[in-house]
Regions:
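Positively charged n-region of N-terminal signal peptides that target proteins for export
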Residues: 1-4
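Bacterial N-terminal signal peptides
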Residues: 7-15
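Sec/Tat signal peptide C-region and signal peptidase I cleavage site
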Residues: 16-20
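Exposed beta-sheet edge and beta->alpha loop/turn motif
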Residues: 83-133
């Protein structure tokens, strides 16, 4: 019984640590989406992790990838946060984004903590769940 209690207490503490970061993570994602909506790819690029910045090399290349590969992120009609979870030490924030055509998309934003704060280290479109608005 004592081991169970210690395990539960540890789980609650760890969960609190993960979800204590949620507001900051949401702020980073919101700021990047706002930059995309303003076509400010230079600002949007600053919210990407150093490894993502290294892959794309410039805000212009990054912007092209987003507008062509993730148009729902570039011009969302609606954004809903579905939950933050820890996937083996990597924090993943799930979002439901409705595009300009009214189609809903579920995406996972993978986050990494740097000296400058939280950065987006990748975005993955979750398998189509047939969502509409």
């Amino acid at each position: 019984m004592r081991k169970w209690f210690i395990g539960m207490a540890l789980s609650v503490c760890l969960a609190g640590a993960v979800f204590g970061q949620e507001a900051e993570i949401k702020g980073v994602i919101n700021s990047q989406i706002e930059a995309f909506q303003a076509d400010d790819f230079a600002s949007a690029f600053t919210y990407a992790s150093p490894s993502i910045q290294g892959i794309f090399g410039s805000p212009e290349n990054f912007g092209r990838m987003v507008t062509q590969g993730f148009p729902m992120v570039w011009r969302p009609a609606d954004v809903e946060y579905l939950g933050l979870r820890d996937e083996g030490g990597v924090l993943a924030q799930r979002l439901r984004i409705v595009d300009q055509s009214g189609r809903a998309h579920v995406l996972d934003y993978f986050m990494t903590e740097t000296r400058e704060g939280w950065k987006i280290n990748g975005v993955q479109l979750v398998k189509d769940q047939g969502l509409t608005t």
